[in-house]
């Protein structure tokens, strides 16, 4: 029987865990990162609106902790709102914000959207966690676009029960789902080289896959993003 370790926050992995368990899959929820909110600049402290503005929400956490600061702008018809991933899109829709989402749930997917090919964009406001999305920022700045980071939360490493993870891993090599390069680094610090050889790591992009292999992971499966549907596609393929 296939076994799975989910490493996202519990609230973000509950739906996937329930689906897997309904299918008889032994599933361990083992969050590697936790989130805490940061103070967010109020709208009047952001540069005044000028020209075409694009808002990019990088995660559902960005919606939860950052939308309140720029809701008026996000609701403006002159502003295009982009969501990274289905969960982020659903979070915005639940707040009555119209948004678009690339099929590919990463920075490369955002950059491939038609709006970044054709439109004359003056500024992009990236609502995100502290750090991350460097590729997106560099690419946009290289195109002459003003990029404003709105950091509304930070990730940190919580205390984890390594014995619980070890016990689960001893019962058979699982599929381990990680959503970021940071999570791969954290996981690598917690497991043995034998686990890296025997377990399959499911990652959200080619960039993270390359990072995982460089850290010693032998079996790396690349998903089309970090979302549940992308993982299920890989899960089905590995059966």
Predicted features along the sequence, with ranges:
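Signature of uroporphyrinogen-III synthase
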Residues: 1-239
């Amino acid at each position: 029987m296939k076994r799975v370790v989910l490493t996202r926050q519990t609230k973000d992995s509950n739906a996937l865990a329930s689906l897997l368990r309904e299918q008889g899959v032994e599933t361990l929820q083992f969050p590697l990162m936790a989130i805490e909110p940061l103070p967010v600049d109020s709208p009047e402290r952001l540069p005044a609106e000028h020209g075409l503005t694009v808002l990019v929400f990088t995660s559902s956490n960005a919606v939860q902790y950052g939308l309140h600061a720029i809701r008026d702008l996000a609701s403006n018809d002159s502003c295009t709102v982009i969501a990274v991933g289905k969960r982020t899109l659903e979070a915005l829709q639940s707040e009555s914000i119209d948004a678009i989402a690339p099929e590919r749930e990463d920075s490369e997917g955002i950059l491939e959207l038609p709006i970044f090919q054709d439109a004359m964009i003056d500024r992009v406001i990236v609502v995100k966690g502290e750090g991350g999305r460097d590729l997106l920022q560099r690419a946009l700045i290289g195109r002459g676009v003003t990029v404003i980071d709105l950091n509304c939360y930070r990730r940190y490493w919580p205390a984890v029960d390594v014995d619980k993870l070890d016990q689960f891993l001893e019962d058979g090599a699982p599929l381990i789902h990680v959503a970021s390069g940071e999570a791969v680094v954290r996981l690598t610090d917690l497991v043995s080289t034998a686990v890296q050889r025997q377990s399959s790591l499911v990652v959200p992009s080619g960039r993270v896959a390359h990072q995982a292999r460089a850290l010693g992971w032998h079996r790396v499966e690349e998903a089309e993003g970090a979302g549940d549907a992308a993982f299920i596609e890989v899960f089905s393929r590995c059966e």
